[in-house]
């Protein structure tokens, strides 16, 4: 990929972000719950799931094992380019429901990875902006043009790593007098006494922030639910 295209992506991503922040400041709501709409318990709910590869994908697979597929449809599985493990996990998750018609109600969405292990800081900034641009296009702009009243998904579940921070930021843009995506973050089983960096960044934005160990729940808006995986 040429440097010119990287710069172009960076400029577009930065423009999206600045515009979103300005809109958010102009139309800031008194509280997040003021836009919450009533949803009957048996109503259909579109679901977005981020599969972060490796252990994150394995934990998410366990979290979804008891999912009510009749209610949560359609489902969109978001994964990073080249993550074959997560693609196999999607196949396993969906096939576990056997012959249910609803188990076919799912889609796949591939995004560039925001950061790779050991990646230098400068190139990380470029890759994050690239991911932000693609995510803003696919999760915010295109759905907004298709149907301004409906978000990309009704509910987004994430558990790390870094790319999920970009997804949450983009999903949060709609909280400007629009129906928005509810966000649930589940901290990794491995985080026993403290939150991950992704968790610390997402905590102020999540509607529900769940941890699996009591020592990791260090504030009022963190919910300890015990072991979930």
Swiss-Prot record:
Which molecular function terms from Gene Ontology are attached? N-acetylglucosaminyldiphosphodolichol N-acetylglucosaminyltransferase activity
In this entry, the parts of the chain located on the Cytoplasmic side of the membrane are 28-229
The cellular location(s) given in this protein's UniProt record come to: Endoplasmic reticulum membrane; Nucleus membrane
Q: Give the bilayer topology.
A: Single-pass membrane protein
Does the keyword section mention rRNA processing? no
Q: Which residues cross the membrane?
A: 7-27
Q: Which terms are listed as keywords in the entry?
A: Endoplasmic reticulum, Membrane, Nucleus, Transmembrane, Transmembrane helix
Mapped to this chain, the residue ranges on the Lumenal side of the membrane are 1-6
Family matches, as InterPro entries: Oligosacch_biosynth_Alg14
Report the superkingdom from the record.
Answer: Eukaryota
Quote a single Gene Ontology cellular component term: UDP-N-acetylglucosamine transferase complex
A biological-process GO annotation: dolichol-linked oligosaccharide biosynthetic process
Keyword Membrane assigned: yes
Q: How does it assemble?
A: Heterodimer with ALG13 to form a functional enzyme.
Q: Relate the protein's function as given in its record.
A: Involved in protein N-glycosylation. Essential for the second step of the dolichol-linked oligosaccharide pathway. Anchors the catalytic subunit ALG13 to the ER.
Q: Which family does it belong to?
A: Belongs to the ALG14 family.
The protein in question is named UDP-N-acetylglucosamine transferase subunit ALG14
Q: Which organism is it from?
A: Cryptococcus neoformans var. neoformans serotype D (strain B-3501A) (Filobasidiella neoformans)
- Phylogenetic classification of the source organism: Eukaryota, Fungi, Dikarya, Basidiomycota, Agaricomycotina
């Amino acid at each position: 990929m040429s440097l010119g295209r990287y710069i172009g992506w960076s400029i577009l991503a930065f423009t999206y972000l600045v515009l979103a922040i300005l809109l958010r400041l102009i139309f800031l709501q008194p509280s997040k719950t003021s836009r919450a709409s009533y949803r009957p318990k048996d109503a259909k709910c579109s679901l977005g799931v981020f599969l972060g590869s490796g252990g994150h994908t394995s934990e998410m697979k366990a979290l979804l094992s008891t999912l009510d597929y009749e209610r949560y449809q359609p489902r969109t599985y978001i994964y990073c380019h080249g993550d074959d493990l997560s693609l196999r996990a999607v196949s396993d998750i969906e096939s576990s429901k056997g012959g249910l018609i609803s188990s076919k109600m799912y889609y796949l969405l591939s995004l560039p990875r925001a950061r790779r292990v050991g990646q230098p800081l400068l190139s990380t900034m470029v890759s994050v902006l690239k991911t932000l641009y693609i995510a803003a296009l696919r999760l915010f702009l295109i759905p907004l043009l298709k149907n301004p009243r409906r978000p990309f998904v009704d509910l987004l579940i994430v558990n790390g790593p870094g790319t999920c921070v970009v997804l949450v930021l983009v999903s949060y843009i709609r909280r400007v007098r629009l129906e928005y995506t509810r966000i649930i973050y589940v901290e990794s089983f491995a985080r026993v006494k403290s939150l991950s960096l992704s968790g610390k960044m997402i905590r102020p934005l999540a509607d529900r922030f769940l941890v699996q160990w009591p020592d990791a729940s260090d504030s009022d808006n963190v919910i300890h639910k015990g072991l979930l995986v």
